[in-house]
From Swiss-Prot:
Binding site for ATP: 162-169
Subcellular location: Plastid membrane
Designated name of the protein: ATP synthase subunit beta, plastid
EC number: 7.1.2.2
Self-association and partners: F-type ATPases have 2 components, CF(1) - the catalytic core - and CF(0) - the membrane proton channel. CF(1) has five subunits: alpha(3), beta(3), gamma(1), delta(1), epsilon(1). CF(0) has four main subunits: a(1), b(1), b'(1) and c(9-12).
Membrane topology annotation: Peripheral membrane protein
Major place of residence: plastid
Role, per record: Produces ATP from ADP in the presence of a proton gradient across the membrane. The catalytic sites are hosted primarily by the beta subunits.
InterPro entries, per database record: AAA+_ATPase, ATP-synt_VA_C, ATP_synth_F1_bsu, ATPase_a/bsu_AS, ATPase_alpha/beta_chains, ATPase_F1/V1/A1_a/bsu_N, ATPase_F1/V1/A1_a/bsu_N_sf, ATPase_F1/V1/A1_a/bsu_nucl-bd
One GO BP annotation of this record: proton motive force-driven mitochondrial ATP synthesis
Gene3D superfamilies: 2.40.10.170, Bovine Mitochondrial F1-atpase, Atp Synthase Beta Chain, Chain D, domain 3 (1.10.1140.10), P-loop containing nucleotide triphosphate hydrolases (3.40.50.300)
Keyword line: ATP synthesis, ATP-binding, CF(1), Hydrogen ion transport, Ion transport, Membrane, Nucleotide-binding, Plastid, Translocase, Transport
MF terms (GO), sorted A to Z: ATP binding; ATP hydrolysis activity; proton-transporting ATP synthase activity, rotational mechanism
Length: 481
């Protein structure tokens, strides 16, 4: 963040309560709400202090209450605080690709500072209604299970549910890779209140898979913005807005389709709850901030399609105590167009991506949006898999031979479908030894229709495992023994 200090407008710290600072200004010119304030001083050991905070409340008597974006270690009453005269601004544009930033837009990857000639404020209005693109269109990902059973909306918001070790990171990286290759777009990853280790692992894996191009950093496909778990609540509350601002530039100025990943959207609301309590607001239900819905709405309404481009957002959602009625996830669900649920059961079978075909949903899966053929195919696939699920208890007790011929046929086709929903990923080529596959929606529908019709009953289920389109499964030629 570039700091422009208005030297005439400064105040002094009068109270420090953790990350909350009360600052009294002497002149008549008071900072406005959301203005960035900077503290440049030395601590008791003579080390430099540089802290940025954001005005949250105007208390009267020339006093403001601000929330710090940095740790407040070393601060003391009486220190001078400067009003920068504007809200937080962060660098945007191609110079952000391949780099890691913090909430202030400062690079934290030890590769030197980024170009700050292009900057935008993190607090911006949502696009005007007249600028929105209201046309319903599918955002093709090239991943069979997603495109067929829970398609993403262009400019929509998708909730990604999954525990540790079920392939969430690999799915995120494949989506970043596919949007770059197919749509010519870029991605922005916002790590909100995540573990530092996970953020580091993601960065290293992106470098290994080529999503971040170390040789030519500007040719990378993703920008990373991190506000880790150990950061003050102010930083965790604003890091999502920093990532969103970078994505908005690619949509509005570069006219691109952008993928915005937020991991984890619950941590954004949790940080808001901490800040609200520190500011002395009365809590709402379950201790959350009274402004829960408006904070979420302000973020989500900026994630949309315009006539220039789109931001399609994939948000990891943590469910506290597995309680879907908790105000944080319940507020999030109201904004989602689709849910992608990752299943540990499928991951244990080696079926990747481990997307649960029966639990994942999408508002786009309607015949007047996706077309009659796509809709019928998806419903038939779900019915077959649902029937297979119902029969599994009987199979476990009595065995497959005790089923009727019709049910045995359903089980055989369901097992083929389950395996055909798997797919080799480009970003996992190093681990699987298989070349990655991008499958168009038309090829996906054709393949599942052939399985459902019985035309491929002669092939063994192994022919459908980790393949791209149906021609590849047929060419494998594993006939039943």
């Amino acid at each position: 963040m570039t700091v422009f200090i208005e030297t005439q407008n400064f105040g002094t710290i009068t109270r420090i309560i953790g990350p909350v600072l009360d600052i009294t200004f002497t002149g008549n010119k008071m900072p406005k709400i959301y203005h960035a304030l900077s503290i440049i001083d030395k601590n008791s050991e003579g080390l430099d202090i540089f802290i940025v905070c954001e005005v949250q409340q105007l208390l009267g008597d020339h006093c403001v209450r601000a929330i710090s974006m940095n740790a407040t270690d070393g601060l003391k009453r009486g220190m001078t605080v400067f009003d920068t005269g504007d809200v937080l601004k962060v660098p945007v544009g191609r110079s952000t690709l391949g780099r890691i930033f913090n909430v202030l837009g400062e690079t934290i990857d030890n590769l030197g500072p980024a170009d700050t000639s292009n900057q935008l404020p993190i607090h911006r209005s949502a696009p005007k209604f007249i600028d929105l693109d209201t046309k319903l269109s599918i955002f093709e990902t090239g991943i069979k299970v997603v495109d067929l059973l829970a398609p993403y909306r262009r400019g929509g918001k998708i909730g990604l549910f999954g525990g540790a070790g079920v392939g969430k990171t690999v799915l995120i990286m494949e989506l970043i890779n596919n949007i770059a290759k197919t749509h010519g777009g870029v991605s922005v990853f916002g790590g909100v209140g995540e573990r530092t280790r996970e953020g580091n692992d993601l960065y290293m894996e992106m470098k290994e898979s080529g999503i971040i191009n170390e040789a030519l950093i500007s040719e990378s496909k993703v920008a990373l913005v991190y506000g880790q778990m150990n950061e003050p609540p102010g930083a965790r509350m604003r890091v999502g807005l920093t990532a969103l601002t970078m994505a908005e530039y690619f949509r509005d100025v570069s006219s691109q389709d952008v993928l915005l990943f937020i991991d984890n959207i619950f941590r954004f609301l949790q940080a808001g709850s901490e800040v609200s309590a520190l500011l002395g607001r009365l809590p709402s239900a379950v201790g959350y901030q009274p402004t829960l819905a408006s904070e979420m709405g302000a973020l989500q309404e900026r994630i949309t399609s315009t006539k220039d481009g789109s931001i399609t957002s994939i948000q990891a959602v943590y469910i506290p105590a597995d309680d879907l009625t908790d105000p944080a996830p319940a507020t999030t669900f109201a904004h989602l167009d689709a849910t992608t649920v990752l299943s540990r059961g499928l991951a244990s079978k080696g079926i990747y991506p481990a997307v649960d075909p029966l639990e994942s949903t999408s508002t786009m899966l309607q015949p007047w949006i996706v077309g009659e053929e796509h809709y019928k195919c998806s419903q038939n696939v779900k019915q077959t898999l649902q029937r297979y699920k119902e029969l599994q208890d009987i199979i476990a007790i009595l065995g497959l031979d005790e089923l009727s011929p019709d049910d045995r046929l359903i089980v055989a086709r369901a097992r083929k479908i389950e395996r055909f929903l798997s797919q080799p990923f480009f970003v996992a080529e190093l681990f699987t030894g298989l070349p990655g596959k991008y499958v168009s929606l038309a090829k996906t529908i054709q393949g599942f229709n052939l399985i459902l019709s019985g035309d491929l009953d002669a092939l063994s289920e192994q022919a459908f495992y980790l393949v791209g389109d149906i021609e590849e499964a047929i060419s494998k030629g594993f006939l039943k023994k």
